[in-house]
Amino acid sequence: MTLEQELRQLSKAKARAQRNGQLCEEAVCCHQLGELLASHGRFQEALEEHQQELHLLESVQDTLGCAVAHRKIGERLAEMENYSAALKHQHLYLDLAGSLSNHTELQRAWATIGRTHLDVYDHCQSRDSLLQAQAAFEKSLAIVDEKLEGMLTQRELSEMRTRLYLNLGLTCESLQQTAQCNNYFKKSIFLAEQNHLYEDLFRARYNLGAIHWRGGQHSQAMRCLEGARECARAMKMRFMESECCMLVSQVLQDLGDFLAAKRALKKAYRLGSQKPNQRVAICQSLKYVLAVVRLQQQLQEAEGNDLQGAMAICEQLGDLFSKADDFPKASEAYQKQLHFAELLNRPDLELAVIHESLATTLGDMKDYHKAVHHYEEELRLRKGNALEEAKTWFNIGLAREEAGDAYELLAPCFQKAFGCAQQAQRYQLQRQILQHLYTVQLKLQPQEARDTEIRLQELSMAKDTEEEEEEEEEEEEEASEALETSEMELSESEDDADGLSQQLEEEEELQGCVGRRKINKWNRRNDMGETLLHRACIEGQLRRVQDLVKQGHPLNPRDYCGWTPLHEACNYGHLEIVRFLLDHGAAVDDPGGQGCDGITPLHDALNCGHFEVAELLIERGASVTLRTRKGLSPLETLQQWVKLYFRDLDLETRQKAASMERRLQMASSGQASHSSPALQTIPNNHLFDPETSPPSSPCPKPPSYTPRPPEASPAPAKVFLEETVSAVCRPRKNRHRPASSSSSSEDDDDNTNPCRPSQKRLRHSTQQGEAKTPDPSKSRETAISSACRAAYQAAIRGVGSAQSRRLVPSLPRGSNEVPAPKTALIPEEEFLAEEWLEVDTPLTRSSSSSRPSTSISDYERCPARPRTRAKQSRPASLDGWCTRTKAADASLTAEPTENSSMPRTTGPNKENCAAGQPLLLVQPPPIRVRVQIQDNLFLIPVPHSDVHSVAWLAEQAAQRYFQTCGLLPRLTLRKDGALLAPQDPIPDVLQSNDEVMAEVTSWDLPPLKDRYRRACQSLGQGEHQQVLQAMEHQSSSPSFSACSLALCQAQLTPLLRALKLHTALRELRLSGNRLGDPCATELLATLGTMPNLVLLDLSSNHLGPEGLRQLVEGSLGQTAFQNVEELDLSMNPLGDGCAQALASLLRTCPVLRTLRLQACGFSPSFFLSHQAALGSAFKDAEHLKTLSLSYNTLGAPALARVLQSLPTCTLLHLELSSVAASKSNSSLIEPVIKYLTKEGCALAHLTLSANCLSDKAVRELSRCLPSCPSLTSLDLSANPEVSCAGLEELLSALQERPQGLSFFDLSGCSIQGPLNSDLWDKILSQLQELQLCSKDLTTKDRDTLCQRLPAGACTLNQGSKLFFKCL
């Protein structure tokens, strides 16, 4: 049905509902009309329909319907780039959804708002919009995780997450948060593959391909785009496939393969475009590519016998590339032109012009120093022409300025340019040079700017004696004749040609290329460089592979990226094909070409989770020690795969991964001494094997220049082909708008099992299912006339088969869909989907491959290019590609019930035919057993694939407990008090959903180092070498220290888990790390297993009040702190809000003797909120001997409250350094005096350093000393207002006591010498140790001390220090 027919039908239904007064039905019609119009780009008309829908729903007071209408209006406004109005409606949608407490619509609303903010960023490059988009997507994701889990089907939740992950990936890519971007894209692709979400998979792969392309990673880009193209073919969305072909052509142009780019563009043209401007862009790009191809062919002809013609062609190519902003290729063309010109001994003037072109191009590439070199060469060749010398000197100055050279290098260039312009009497040029020099001087040398300004004024007043002549040379020479219409080969009749004629046309075209050698039939390749054997291996056609090899097809040809057929078979998990290829001599350790980063078939298989294939490769001698260019061995590749997908793996897959890891470790130990020499014997410096390769690699040698951003600086004015203007503009950061969630997916997912996560190289969309999952294939080989027989054969073929469940032939359809029989005459559009047999011998280039790119297993590295343009476009909105979903929303949920009557356009109609249902193997319902281990309850599925015993169940439960808690228990199981025998089969003693109790009989506790390694592996965390050394050296010590390592939470978790049940540990020091609040629970779990711990140092660990609260609340009723005697929480941002938690902590530490709370951010308001609780806790701390509150700005009032609460009879050591709130806080000493004069005060050491104390404060303190005879140590250092007067007062007071002080510190006080003899007598009689540090002490003081000290005393007399101690 055409668009007009659908519109006419819906309009009639709308009019009928209007006549009958059925407002709801009329609103439904408006909704459908709006959707249909928007899908064809008629946004204004669609907006009017949705506005009418809103009015109708408001009149019937349908709140949910109004909310959806606001969302649709917002989407249409966003598509029309009226973002402020769009956000207004979307926030109304959010408010209405909130008023209904509808979490489904709330999730949609936040996702829609985030998408619009992302559009705003594309429009105006506002970072604030990006941050708002990120926040909105995260809120939407939080609703999915916290509110919708269990409310919707798993498929709907997966589709929501898929789209949100994609949008978050795009947002992080714009924010240049590369690691997060990669993780989000991986999750999106994995979920889309797992749940057969082909439209979302297309978007993720397309956008990831665009990111790889912008990052210069062409190999990954091609594979992602090919995967996206497969999705488009599977959905029969020609416009989407056209977009992929368009972007593929851009990648191929970057690689220098313009013939392949031409074929991709022709396919894009034949497939058609949704919007007229896209079709125009394709045509113009094709004109540009055709021009390049023709010039390159002419250059091949001319290079051998016509150097003059070759030189002219190089100039035309350079001009063409320059106009296309492809400056590296333009530079190469101009360099070749210069080479030919020098061979021909062309005149200096011609050489100067070439140097100028090179300099201009290098400037566009930001390589300014090389540009200066060519400008200098031009200057040498143009000697004597004052005007040209002036322009060249001016260009040199501009280039040096862009390079950031110093003013001393810039000024002479502009001055020489000005002098030459004066000689040429060109006043306009003089003014231009002086004006620029004046600007430079204002920025770099302001004192010289005044003279230049005066010269400018004088020059402006001078009358020009002659008019300026336009000396700009006409550089727009026609590089070639206008393109003939026949050369375009784009007549509409091509659309009607059958596939055979198209293939012959391509072959004729390629055979007609000049300079092509005749190639054999096995070297016929498609756009990706794939041979017949490549395609058969990708598609899992074992019989086809066998036939090709028997007919003599080479075993090891490479595609354009460097992959061999064995790589492809391993990548897609086709076990039997791998076995066959190995039997016939395929290179088992081939590292791939330049674009493959040294990935061997074994790496490929492990990176996709194909363990059976990996096992076969190892058995056949694959090296387990070869490393990729990223330095990854096969074992490390497997560990990365497990780390990435661990949470999504089922138990069986985890067990297979663990088994494979052990296998690799064993094989590594055996191969370590004799690695396979295959790496040296396989040529990896060419893209193809010698037996089938063209003369050189199709991928050009990468230039040293970094890939230019798509938003390049304006091209030079040199143009030879006017029609290529828009074709050569590099596409900017294109994104496909995620589809709306207005309807649930109607794909039949009955047969969708959670698949093993495979990090494919993203060329063809392959879905790997479980071995027994039926696969109704749609390939031509399996299509037969009977629908029932086809479905049956497909199901039987899938049972126990290792064939790939490829995405495209396995596209899910409804259970009542009949496979359409294939006719002998293949329609043209279907031929496109399989068009690949093209004789493709690329143009002669450097033998080097494309630029090194990231490993396919690490395709996440995609550095975003800088943007210089504000406006960014999208290639096409998905609105027009699929009417099932709409733009501007990032999730999928069920449509509200009020709108459920709306018909959805989902593609081909599904007919009811029971015969079309595939025959499924019926499995009994699964057995799930609940196992209780201490406080943890685990639900463990028991697979039917084998009979498992109770011992197996105990092992599974122990592994789950280890994954959760970090400890591996040995268990016995009981059911209703009865002990279960380990050898009994589970079905004989348990039923589904039974709960059994697990008793821990013992713990598996290997050496500390091994426990740490096992915890790191379990958590997917890399080992920290310093922690590993600490574990090894301190394993038998009662003390463990990992201080000052700055370990983050992820690194601390395996450390803490390894320390669990380390019962011999008495001291744990973790100072100087980044524990933080989130890790407090993990710390508490560890402390609960250390009953003998007496010292805990958590200082400087970013622990806040929330973390302290978690420690306290979790320890209630436990023994975590029962024996702790010393606790250090210093330098943690606890703040005043921790008072309640601190009080509780004191109560949970009944034997605490030392508490250090230095620099915890306590302020004068400390003790106010929970004074009673905290005061009571301190008073009850009867064992507390040492308390440090130093470096907290408490002030006198707060200090008074603290001291009132402290026990007087037990506290011996009190540190109060730098607790004054201000310098004028003179009353600080008063609460201290009150404490010291309390009855029974037992304080022995008091620190009051750095509190701005004066002699008056010391005098007051001295008066109370006779009342506190227990005080024997006093620290008054760093109080510069304390002088000799204060010292004398204190010494006099000490004479009234039975004993003096064992320690007295006055370092940093204003003690001025020389001290009199009486004072020295008091010092030596009352003090056992004194520390003085003052610049005012004299030599006489030092001499006096040395003379008076008794025998055996120690002294330190150096600089301003004067210390002594009587032993």
Curated annotation (Swiss-Prot):
Q: What is known of its domains?
A: The ANK repeats mediate the interaction with the MCM complex and histones, while the LRR repeats mediate the interaction with MMS22L.
Q: InterPro entries recorded for this chain? A: Ankyrin_rpt, Ankyrin_rpt-contain_sf, Leu-rich_rpt, Leu-rich_rpt_Cys-con_subtyp, LRR_dom_sf, MMS22L-TONSL_complex_comp, TPR-like_helical_dom_sf, TPR_rpt
- Role: Component of the MMS22L-TONSL complex, a complex that promotes homologous recombination-mediated repair of double-strand breaks (DSBs) at stalled or collapsed replication forks. The MMS22L-TONSL complex is required to maintain genome integrity during DNA replication. It mediates the assembly of RAD51 filaments on single-stranded DNA (ssDNA): the MMS22L-TONSL complex is recruited to DSBs following histone replacement by histone chaperones and eviction of the replication protein A complex (RPA/RP-A) from DSBs.
Q: Which organism is it from?
A: Rattus norvegicus
Q: What is the lineage of its organism?
A: Eukaryota, Metazoa, Chordata, Craniata, Vertebrata
Give the compositionally biased regions (Pro residues). Answer: 692-713
Name of this chain's protein:
Tonsoku-like protein
Q: Name one GO molecular function term.
A: histone reader activity
Q: Quote the biased-composition stretches of kind Basic and acidic residues, using this chain's numbering.
A: 772-781
Q: Where is the composition biased (Low complexity)?
A: 844-857
Question: Is RNA-binding there in the keyword field?
Answer: no
Repeat region (TPR), residues: 27-60, 67-100, 107-147, 162-195, 202-235, 242-275, 311-344, 352-385, 390-424
Q: Which family does it belong to?
A: Belongs to the Tonsoku family.
Pfam families xref list:
Ank_2 (PF12796), LRR_6 (PF13516)
Q: Where is the composition biased (Polar residues)?
A: 666-684, 894-909
The record's subcellular location field reads: Nucleus; Chromosome; Cytoplasm
The gene is: Tonsl
Oligomeric form and interacting partners: Component of the MMS22L-TONSL complex, a complex at least composed of MMS22L and TONSL/NFKBIL2. Interacts with the MCM complex, the FACT complex and the RPA complex. Interacts with MCM5; the interaction is direct. Binds histones, with a strong preference for histone H3.1 (histones H3.1 and H3-4/H3.1t). Interacts (via ANK repeats) with histone H4; specifically binds histone H4 lacking methylation at 'Lys-20' (H4K20me0). May interact with DNAJC9; the interaction seems to be histone-dependent.
Record field: compositional bias (Acidic residues): 465-509
Q: Where are the LRR repeats?
A: 1062-1086, 1090-1118, 1121-1144, 1181-1205, 1240-1263, 1268-1293, 1324-1347
